Amino acid sequence: MNHKSKKRIKEAKRSARPELKDSQDWCRHNYCEVFSLNPSTVLDNVERVDAAQLTTEEFIERYEKPYKPVVIINATAGWPANEKWTLERLKRKYRNQKFKCGEDNDGYSVKMKMKYYIDYMEGTRDDSPLYIFDSSYGEHPKRKKILEDYEVPKYFRDDLFQFTGEKRRPPYRWFVMGPPRSGTGIHIDPLGTSAWNSLVHGHKRWCLFPTNTPRELIKVTRDEGGNQQDEAITWFNVVYPRTQLPSWPPEFKPLEILQKPGETVFVPGGWWHVVLNFDTAIAVTQNFASCSNFPVVWHKTVRGRPKLSRKWYRILKQERPELAALADTVDLQESTGIASDSSSDSSSSSSSSSSESCSEDDSSSGAEMMSRRKKKRRLCNGMGNGDITTQDDCASKERSSSR
């Protein structure tokens, strides 16, 4: 690794994780040596279905409507990404393009050129390495070529947030890439949206918990996690062993997945989930609002993003009047029954948010969270325009990429 590469990597690490003062802090737990990344340790107890044999209607009835996680095989067949997304080809094609690999303490993106990031990936011994989790590639003149390498699987093409306009809609798609031990800390995706994650290369370990799982049961405390409180590897080291004890409540036993190349994980709205990369992993993931989850997403958007909801409603009235009519029937005073994770209101660059409470509505999001943090947060992708929880949506999927 040349001097310039080392310098750029050091700068990115210092910006993304200022609480880690030196190289010793980054490797303090020696997870590179002592943490097992053996696939045989994963129970892998989630149902798998074949995209070639499952219609969209069957998927909606069997999985989406009942909020049931599932792993889909063959949904990525024919993707150019299967051949194009190798380290060698990505380094060649996007060599000097910058990708987000974290956030600083003011909420600004920390970015690294692909050539430097791959140098970092290939040599890191960090406990929880920096992780590319980039949501802006689709708007960039060169990086948007990534969009040509995959297509949204047939089950997830209902994209109702498109009716808010591209400039206003919350971030919803991410190109993700990271080395072993990188990952995404435990969280619930924002605004009641569901998600899909298609893995092109590598292996990912998932744990998922139902929406009614008590937050205090599955969150790492500051005393337990210290500076690595919000990291996926910390969660698997601290919390996961408890889930296997006889004393763990049986109704909150995790679903476990060892996601393999070519597999797509469906995460219904409200499900807690944590993801750890077992090896070099390259994937694409998107959040979505569909006709099935629209009542919940609408409820949470009105409560958490009121200005966005008004714009959304006006366009739905014109383009999808049946959904505007459905929105009129949603009782905003009743709980949705689908939890919200207030720690997803902030990236893990704001560790103070990790002790906030989880609730079944969005009544405490927004102004309260922002005033408690008292941080200057950049509006993500030019969105916001008066919505106080704009940053909440930007950071949910990016929590451990920035910490």
UniProtKB/Swiss-Prot annotation:
Main location class: nucleus
Question: What protein is this chain from?
Answer: Bifunctional arginine demethylase and lysyl-hydroxylase JMJD6-B
Subcellular location(s): the record lists: Nucleus, Nucleoplasm; Nucleus, Nucleolus; Cytoplasm
Q: Which GO terms describe its cellular component?
A: cytoplasm; nucleolus; nucleoplasm; nucleus
Could you say which EC number(s) this protein's record lists? 1.14.11.-
Q: Provide the JmjC domain boundaries.
A: 141-305
For molecular function, the Gene Ontology terms on record are:
histone demethylase activity; histone H3R2 demethylase activity; histone H4R3 demethylase activity; metal ion binding; P-TEFb complex binding; peptidyl-lysine 5-dioxygenase activity; single-stranded RNA binding
Q: Where is this motif: Nuclear localization signal 1?
A: 6-10
Ranges annotated as biased composition (Low complexity): 340-357
Where in this protein would one find the motif Nuclear localization signal 5, according to its record?
Answer: 373-378
Gene (UniProt)? jmjd6-b
Q: Which organism is it from?
A: Xenopus laevis (African clawed frog)
Regions that span the bilayer: none
Write out the entry's keywords from A to Z.
Answer: Chromatin regulator, Cytoplasm, Developmental protein, Differentiation, Dioxygenase, Iron, Metal-binding, mRNA processing, mRNA splicing, Nucleus, Oxidoreductase, RNA-binding, Transcription, Transcription regulation
> At which positions is Fe cation bound?
H187, D189, H273
Question: What family classification does the UniProt entry report for this protein?
Answer: Belongs to the JMJD6 family.
- What is the documented function of this protein? Dioxygenase that can both act as a arginine demethylase and a lysyl-hydroxylase. Acts as a lysyl-hydroxylase that catalyzes 5-hydroxylation on specific lysine residues of target proteins such as u2af2/u2af65 and LUC7L2. Regulates RNA splicing by mediating 5-hydroxylation of u2af2/u2af65, affecting the pre-mRNA splicing activity of u2af2/u2af65. Hydroxylates its own N-terminus, which is required for homooligomerization. In addition to peptidyl-lysine 5-dioxygenase activity, may act as an RNA hydroxylase, as suggested by its ability to bind single strand RNA.
| Cofactor(s) required for function per UniProt | Fe(2+)
Annotated spans, Disordered: 336-403
Q: Which domain of life is it from?
A: Eukaryota
Catalytic activity of the protein: L-lysyl-[protein] + 2-oxoglutarate + O2 = (5S)-5-hydroxy-L-lysyl-[protein] + succinate + CO2; N(omega),N(omega)'-dimethyl-L-arginyl-[protein] + 2 2-oxoglutarate + 2 O2 = L-arginyl-[protein] + 2 formaldehyde + 2 succinate + 2 CO2; N(omega),N(omega)'-dimethyl-L-arginyl-[protein] + 2-oxoglutarate + O2 = N(omega)-methyl-L-arginyl-[protein] + formaldehyde + succinate + CO2; a 5'-end methyltriphosphate-guanosine-ribonucleotide-snRNA + 2-oxoglutarate + O2 = a 5'-end triphospho-guanosine-ribonucleotide-snRNA + formaldehyde + succinate + CO2 + H(+)
Which EC class is this protein assigned?
A: oxidoreductase
Record comment regarding domains? The nuclear localization signal motifs are necessary and sufficient to target it into the nucleus.
